[in-house]
Amino acid sequence: MIRKIAFCAGMICCGWLQAGYAQVEVELPEPAPVVYDTNYISSYRYRLTTRVYVSQKYTVFTLPTDDGNFMLFRPNNTFNQGVGWTYRGFSINLGFGLPGINGNSSQRGKSSWLDCQMHMYGRRNTIDVFLQRYQGYYIGQGKLPGYEGYYNDEAIKVRTFGGIYTHIHNWKRYSFRFGATQDEFQKRSSGSLLYGMTVLYSLVKKDDEGIAHPGIAGLARYSEVGRINTWNIGPHIGYGYNWIFLKRWYLGAAVNMAATLSLYQENKGMGSPNPEPGPYLTGTHADIAPSAIGRLAAGYNSDRWGVAFYYVHHTHLNRSYIGQYTSGSVG
């Protein structure tokens, strides 16, 4: 059975419950002088930029079923809207939940979360740091055999933390950050080789019993497994390209592939039948886990305003599945 662990990162942000979140971005210190090709990149570093945005961040996980499929668990978090500012590489966003567009929210149960992400966009290098705590998950309507409504469990918890370092080889002509921070513009199409290192820890747990309720068809194994721990570490390499057309419109994409060393453990829940203290249910296993980090950006920029869409997704493949996604639009 194959498990995926996916991680998605936005900018520096903290969110708590469904009241919204504050978001901060910091830029890596750049050695002076930093000389980039002004025929390819325009910088608005010393101008105050303001934006209005809509975004959604969520962490999901799936468990493999007895028939070889996967059962998807999602938190009940919301779309958010807010306003943000950037000046000299420092950004702050203030957001809150959007009323009226998160239908069936009460049927999906209650979720709480603390989602902190810090993204430091330097000219030559970037660093992404993650710290996420989610509690309360549901299975989609009609997805559970013999159950027509939403199945929710407010006791399931997910924890992730880690970081990604990326070096930008063609930093003089390729802007890695312009789609995310709005303080820079790619004037001509350009790309770059990207490479670096990934470290990620993830935990899925339920304190007093197995992660899956015994009544969930196809997940009998996980009615006893109360903790799933995973470490992933390894190098990544890829390519990013920004395509500029009609002078002001752009599409950007960056993909990094990796083969990480994956260490994972499964432990019985405290309330499972015949709990075994001490050793993990399956011991500690190690394998090589493929990984992918993808970023997409699209939009329009003028000298005074712009509209942008930005999406980031980070995926690891091993023996279970955890995933975080970030998507948003900026005006």
Regions found by a protein language model. Name each.
Residues 24, 34-46, 124, 170-191, ...:
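Short loop/turn motifs that connect adjacent beta-strands in outer-membrane beta-barrel proteins
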Residues 48, 79-83, 112-116, 159-163, ...:
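Hydrophobic, lipid-facing positions within transmembrane beta-strands of outer-membrane proteins
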Residues 44-50, 79, 88-90, 123-127, ...:
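Outer-envelope beta-barrel architecture signal
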Residues 52, 81-87, 116-120, 163-169, ...:
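Residues on the lipid-exposed face of transmembrane beta-strands in outer-membrane beta-barrel proteins
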Residues 54-60, 87-91, 96-102, 122-124, ...:
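Transmembrane beta-strands of outer-membrane beta-barrel pores
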Residues 59-70, 124, 252-331:
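Outer membrane beta-barrel transmembrane domains
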Residues 57-80, 91-109:
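Surface-exposed strand-loop-strand hairpins of Gram-negative outer-membrane beta-barrel proteins
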Residues 72, 138-144, 148-162, 203-214, ...:
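Extracellular/periplasm-exposed beta-strand and loop segments of Gram-negative cell-envelope proteins
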